[in-house]
């Protein structure tokens, strides 16, 4: 069958990953809960807000890398808390220095504190500089397919459209824009922000996303470690459903059992 989908590896910056779940490190009660939840998630890529989390820039304070060692996890420094391109570029340079030349970064440039929507103009400016400086840029963006295309053409290695506002747990608010982005994508597309529970993650994967990044959905759950495990299974289920191909939707019923040979 020509429409049968075959799985392909999840590759970022030349490295292949088994888990398609990426997780954040903020909002947990303490370091131990952070460690346990991330272990339960099965994630291999962990994103860290460089401006809010100590990864070596504050000697003498607890260092997140003590519980999430870079030899076990791929650390994905992000620019959360940056509101212009200059701040974002400076933060990425600091992260590269702290992580011994590490080039993989998650770029996010926010528009305001109320919505945490991406400022796409500043994001485009920052992305252009970072790509020229040799960074492997994964970029948080709006669900505008044109902006996503421009970021990919600029050289970003992955685009990460929001599913809903950061921290809201509203789920996949605009699956139609996301579908357009996926259809046009020349780089991996990861849903970033808005996921609230396991079914949201599954829907994102069923649509064809390469992976999902989340933080609040796990950290704000009543039992974060249990939710982390639920998310691990949700990602796998969604990917398998995408590869399997769902049945077509119909307006009218269709009997599961054949009508031929009915007992009279």
UniProtKB/Swiss-Prot annotation:
GO terms for biological process: thiamine diphosphate biosynthetic process. Its EC number is 2.8.1.10. One of its GO terms (molecular function) is thiazole synthase activity. 1-deoxy-D-xylulose 5-phosphate binds at residues 167, 193-194, 215-216. It comes from the Bacteria. Disulfide bonds: none annotated. Pathway: Cofactor biosynthesis; thiamine diphosphate biosynthesis. Keywords: Cytoplasm, Schiff base, Thiamine biosynthesis, Transferase. Belongs to the ThiG family. This is Thiazole synthase. It comes from Pseudomonas fluorescens (strain ATCC BAA-477 / NRRL B-23932 / Pf-5).
